[in-house]
Amino acid sequence: DPLRAKFIAENFLEDAVCFNEVRNMFGYTGTYKGERISVMGTGMGMPSISIYARELIVDYGVKKLIRVGTAGSLNENVHVRELVLAQAAATNSNIIRNDWPQYDFPQIASFNLLDKAYHIAKNFGMTTHVGNVLSSDEKYSNYFEKNIELGKWGVKAVEMEAAALYYLAAQHQVDALAIMTISDSLVNPDEDTTAEERQNTFTDMMKVGLETLIAD
């Protein structure tokens, strides 16, 4: 979300400068506790994040990438506003299978970032879940019941970008992690949040992401 990047820059970074406005995909560089940090929107879905993440890695030499965004719960024990750290990302997309047609290439987080983020979140007292997520090509899937079934297999949530991010990180040997806030629930329909809340109030994941990037 480009407006989420703007929110992070305005509320967490010092001396933030906008370095990109092309396609309204705002990007900012500033400092957080003395460390230079960049934040940028990546659009919606795996094709979009694949473009921006690859350019950040290949053209700008970025070595650590953390996605902060929203996800829908697939598990009755994972509730709105709680955090999910994606240890791994299953996917129904063919993006990866186009490269590896005879393999199920596992999309996993950087353990270094995952371990740091988990302990930082717990030290903050945030309710945090670690496990598998589903990266889907469709927000409004025709396979709703199938996705719900994944929750019974321990999949925490569904989102649209983590698998592609982890795949690019593996390809280019850099570190990546996806930190999501649960914005709604597929198993508890009464749990929901507004668009404004999603843009401006999901600050826990932002704090964890920033602290993880500067942790020793």
UniProtKB/Swiss-Prot annotation:
The record marks 198 as: Important for catalytic activity. Gene3D superfamilies: Nucleoside phosphorylase domain. InterPro entries: DeoD-type, Nucleoside_phosphorylase_CS, Nucleoside_phosphorylase_d, Nucleoside_phosphorylase_sf. It comes from the Bacteria. SUPFAM superfamilies: Purine and uridine phosphorylases (SSF53167). It is an enzyme of class 2 (transferase). The active site is at residue 184. Disulfide bonds: none annotated. Phosphate binds at residues 4, 23, 67-70. One of its GO terms (cellular component) is cytosol. PROSITE patterns: PNP_UDP_1. GO terms for biological process: purine nucleoside catabolic process. One of its GO terms (molecular function) is purine-nucleoside phosphorylase activity. Pfam families: PNP_UDP_1. Its EC number is 2.4.2.1. Catalyzes the reversible phosphorolytic breakdown of the N-glycosidic bond in the beta-(deoxy)ribonucleoside molecules, with the formation of the corresponding free purine bases and pentose-1-phosphate. Belongs to the PNP/UDP phosphorylase family. This is Purine nucleoside phosphorylase DeoD-type. It comes from Streptococcus thermophilus. The lineage of its organism: Bacteria, Bacillati, Bacillota, Bacilli, Lactobacillales. The gene is deoD.
